[in-house]
Design a protein with these regions (language model features):
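Histidine/acidic-residue-rich, glycine-tolerant segments that coordinate divalent metal ions
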Residues: 63, 85-87, 93-106, 112-113, ...
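Acidic/His- and Gly-rich active-site-bordering loop/insert found
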Residues: 2-107, 112, 116-136
Length: 251
């Protein structure tokens, strides 16, 4: 390994506590998709401190941003994520389920590390470009809303990936490997059911249960699974079951 590459790697080692502190801070303040305001501010501040030119509010998304360094080709994009999941609050350093806030947000698959690791990689490439004097551009893309928000799709639609020679990312896992592959596309659909409320004991025949309709649709979807190809997935959440009183027809 030549001295320039050693210097680039030394940048990561020298600033390890800095990158780790970002990961820890995002773990401690888990924010849901497209609401990662503290995380976005943390990253844009870090990018500016590291000498990147920062752009905020990409594609009109408040928590999407980029930090670039260098000029010319190759142009290397490095993608970072940082959103959390609802209901997965977890104490750090504990190997058993132990929430900080019961029912609160948490990082179920390491997005606190994902963004910080990508930032470290971008900093290493920046150091290599600066030390070698070679042409090239590195761009760190802050990609919010990975857990269902699909911000990358909007960023692609707006042409943010045009001009890149390569785009790289990583994901925390139990193995250390380099891999390529594809992922399923994702479509989100929100269904709303409306019924007619009625007293379930005294006037049930005049009620129209929206909850019954939800359950019938869900059962139909379960039967549909048998006839779908192996690469398809269906997931669901009932966000409003209509009410909490069993003696009322849920509307």
């Amino acid at each position: 390994m030549n001295e320039i590459k050693k210097a680039a790697l030394h940048t990561v080692e020298e600033n390890a506590s800095f990158f780790t502190s970002i990961s820890d801070a995002i773990w401690d303040e888990p924010e849901l998709s497209l609401k990662e305001f503290k995380a976005a501010a943390l990253y844009t501040d870090a990018l500016e401190k590291l000498g990147f030119t920062v752009q905020k509010n990409l594609c009109g998304i408040e928590t999407a941003f980029s930090g670039s360094y260098g000029s010319g080709h190759p142009v290397i994009g490095i993608l970072g994520e940082f959103d959390a999941l609802s209901g997965l609050s977890q104490e750090s350093g504990v190997a058993v389920p132990q929430s900080v806030t019961p029912g609160g947000n948490g990082h179920g698959c390491g997005h606190n590390m994902l963004g910080a690791g990508s930032l470290a990689a971008a900093a290493a490439v920046k150091e290599y470009l600066a030390a070698s004097g070679k042409p090239g551009t590195v761009i760190f893309f802050g990609c919010p809303g990975e857990e269902g928000g699909a911000a990358k799709a909007y960023m692609a639609r707006e042409g943010l990936w045009y001009g890149l020679d390569a785009a790289l990312t990583w994901h925390p896992s139990d193995t250390n490997e380099v891999s390529t592959g594809t992922n399923n596309s994702c479509i989100q659909v929100l269904y709303k059911f409306h019924g007619i409320a009625a007293h379930a004991a005294g006037d049930p025949h005049n009620g129209r249960s929206a909850l019954d309709a939800v359950e019938l649709m869900n059962i139909g979807v379960q039967f549909l699974r048998e006839h779908m190809t192996d690469d398809c997935r269906i997931h669901y959440a009932i966000t409003d079951a209509g009410g909490v009183s069993p003696n009322v027809v849920q509307a």
